[in-house]
Amino acid sequence: MTELKAKGPRAPHVAGGPPSPEVGSPLLCRPAAGPFQGSQTSDTLPEVSATPISLDGLLFPRPCQGQDPLDEKTQDQQSLSDVEGAYSRAEATRGTGGSSSRPPEKDSGLLDSVLDTLLAPSGPGQSQPSPPACEVTSSWCLFGPELPEDPPAAPATQRVLSPLMSRSGGKAGDSSGTAAAHKVLPRGLSPSRQLLLPASGSPHWSGAPVKPSPQPAAVEVEEEDGSESEDSAGPLLKGKPRALGGAAAGGGAAAVPPGAAAGGVALVPKEDSRFSAPRVALVEQDAPMAPGRSPLATTTMDFTHVPILPLNHALLAARTRQLLEEESYDGGAGAASAFAPPRSSPSASSTPVAVGDFPDCAYPPDAHPKDDAYPLYGDFQPPALKIKEEEEGAEVSARSPRSYLVAGANPAAFPDFPLGPPPPLPPRAPPSRPGEAAVTAAPAGASVSSASSSGSTLECILYKAEGAPPQQGPFAPPPCKAQGAGGCLLPRDGLPSTSTSASAAAAGAAPALYPALGLNGLPQLGYQAAVLKEGLQQVYPPYLNYLRPDSEASQSPQYSFESLPQKICLICGDEASGCHYGVLTCGSCKVFFKRAMEGQHNYLCAGRNDCIVDKIRRKNCPACRLRKCCQAGMVLGGRKFKKFNKVRVMRALDAVALPQPVGIPNESQALSQRFTFSPGQDIQLIPPLINLLVSIEPDVIYAGHDNSKPDTSSSLLTSLNQLGERQLLSVVKWSKLLPGFRNLHIDDQITLIQYSWMSLMVFGLGWRSYKHVSGQMLYFAPDLILNEQRMKESSFYSLCLTMWQIPQEFVKLQVSQEEFLCMKVLLLLNTIPLEGLRSQTQFEEMRSSYIRELIKAIGLRQKGVVSSSQRFYQLTKLLDNLHDLVKQLHLYCLNTFIQSRALSVEFPEMMSEVIAAQLPKILAGMVKPLLFHKK
């Protein structure tokens, strides 16, 4: 293609003479029939007909009627007289077709003088191109909510998507024709629409003739040094909906800077390396509201004090899932690749598309939302943030920035919504990952200007679209999916979890939001009891899999100490046929265990003695299957006890899992004696649960505070945030080893960690202060201990007094380590969503099991029913009081987080995500605390 030079549409007129209305005032010509006007017949455009409206008419503007499409190749070489002649010939041509041009207005001279002043060349020999006036000055809706009042009267042309601009070989800084070779963009278009040129076959405006190319090409953007290469951009739209991220996704018209490329070329602005795509542009406050625009389009938001962070709890869920389910990722959680690949269409080209330039969830002109349903499982993955499992205090390798999506944000639902530029990030700690920002969807007129903003306002800002129900209609599909498609969360269900394939099939193409589960009286979800991931120590399965029968569904299971196990095999997860050899098993595992024990088989594992034993793979490795049978407590002597009543089954399984050190009734004592092994047998029972809790307790964590420097408010808060980040990672690792926790659904695991992390941290602070300094000081870490003097000098003295109450209660009650460990697990299970959890039944049974363990821990020191009951009341009352105490910490933490930039306080990344995603929910009362006693 020959190099084309961009030439301004206005030529200099004769000095002293009046400006030519034909050339000097393109704004005075009649706008051509747009996509919302009636159709007209033209000889030059025989393909135009009165057909139903399509997206082509919305995307590609019609040029002025005063321009001829036949003189494109010679426009840049014409003189002033040639242009005037072409204009008159075009008028004649249009006249023969039945169309007439609009005569100049009576105030054309005034407009000419204004245009001469505003559109004067910026320098000698340079001229700024002025686009035709027929270009629409308001932003267009790419998705369809801004349809005309009379759709049948709107013309449409079914064309192939016109070629997009491509960058020439030279650099942006060259002014000798290379930069001028760029296509001049119309000024009236919003930056996101400037990436599209008129369709092939349609007349172009005289600013820059364009030669169509046979294949659509991706728009390439001028980047800073070190950005992605040109070959990283592939086809933009090919069979799958995609949106143009470009310079602005907000729909506002961006002003052309004076320092633009030579010839007035205004391409997509350069991206700041600190922020991730999609790029956004400012919307001026005094810009008039365009017709068809909603009031949101001109609302200027104040995001100065709102940190730009990933505000989607689904993103945090993906991050935490990487820690909780790292074994199930087949090499997909590398240190350098911490993001899932951008979603791609199954029919799209394999050429990678620049992630920052082309966000997801846009529809091509020739497609309808309902025709592009995402498959349930495919090669696409929603943008998900993953965490690398790292040692505390280790440096995280820097990565290139990527974009976040706001929870529930749907471009179809908010077509005109202006997105302001990302404000500066709050100071980040050194180990946090740099260069990440989030696009925040805020309601009209909402702003956060001070720390005194109410929780409801913050909740509205952070969660405007998150909890909204899916909107019905052709242009408002549920977030990140088209109508008739499976939810975006369904691929997440493909990860190994405790849910059976039957429940996944029952969900089918369920909506993206999981159905709400009540606390009581609702159907139970499918459940694979014995499927544990690789690397998880398979211990204590009998206690973890107690399920309530349907007959007890109406009763409150919160403090039920006796419940009948559901008939699920504790070895392979199949339906159990009864209690065989002391354990609820299926017939297959019963026969296998009998033959293995009586036949004296010497099974050897071909792997690492950690094979998964479930209904499908139970026959793969007999060695691991037999080992699991022995760990569950199966013995040949137990076959005499098949018929148990409810109490006997419970006590028998308790005796198998945990031999009770205190006095027990004679009946269960006889049962426990029958479940013991002779010393000659080479079979080891699992240790008691309390001993296991002691073994998985995290090591000492340091804050990294420099005590040689004087304490300042910012330094103390930053050190506490660094300590909180490391403790949060430690909580995730600890919960992975917690017996029974991995049996819950993966989403329930993430939710419980998000809701209880603050309670666990302050509870651990109280225990360390009680054990190391007898409750006289706050023992945050070995290198960060605050005495009363340092508390008074800090800016959060009242908060320190609040936290100081916990170690003082420990001193008063003389809490033992066994009691503390059981109470710590109950704190993890103390707050749930209002609608319940996905694996609600398993959660209730796990919580009941640890309540029983707390009673056993109390029985180690307290003898007698009365003293044990009083002790249980005191400890559970302390757990209930922690809810109000932690709520004060949540409020202070969120206020500090909002003002972190003004206070110079650094918030690490993972902690920032939890704060931004969950604290507004908790403070707004959108969670349900589980209390032992009524207030």
UniProtKB/Swiss-Prot annotation:
Q: Where is this region: AF1?
A: 456-548
Query: Site of the Glycyl lysine isopeptide (Lys-Gly) (interchain with G-Cter in ubiquitin) crosslink?
Result: 388
The residue ranges of the NR LBD domain are 681-915
Q: Which residues bind DNA?
A: 569-641
Give a single Pfam family match. Hormone_recep
Q: Where is this region: Modulating, Pro-Rich?
A: 1-568
Q: Where is this region: AF3?
A: 1-164
> Which parts of the sequence are annotated with region: AF2?
689-935
**Residue ranges with Pro residues bias:** 418-433
Q: How is it modified after translation?
A: Phosphorylated on multiple serine sites. Several of these sites are hormone-dependent. Phosphorylation on Ser-294 is highly hormone-dependent and modulates ubiquitination and sumoylation on Lys-388. Phosphorylation on Ser-345 also requires induction by hormone. Basal phosphorylation on Ser-81, Ser-162, Ser-190 and Ser-400 is increased in response to progesterone and can be phosphorylated in vitro by the CDK2-A1 complex. Increased levels of phosphorylation on Ser-400 also in the presence of EGF, heregulin, IGF, PMA and FBS.
Q: Report the superkingdom from the record.
A: Eukaryota
Compositionally biased region (Low complexity): 232-246, 335-350, 434-452
Which ranges belong to the motif LXXL motif 2? 115-119
Q: Function, please? A: The steroid hormones and their receptors are involved in the regulation of eukaryotic gene expression and affect cellular proliferation and differentiation in target tissues. Transcriptional activator of several progesteron-dependent promoters in a variety of cell types. Involved in activation of SRC-dependent MAPK signaling on hormone stimulation.
Q: Which family does it belong to?
A: Belongs to the nuclear hormone receptor family.
Q: What is this protein called?
A: Progesterone receptor
Which organism encodes this protein?
A: Macaca sylvanus (Barbary macaque)
Q: Taxonomic lineage per UniProt?
A: Eukaryota, Metazoa, Chordata, Craniata, Vertebrata
Gene behind the chain: PGR
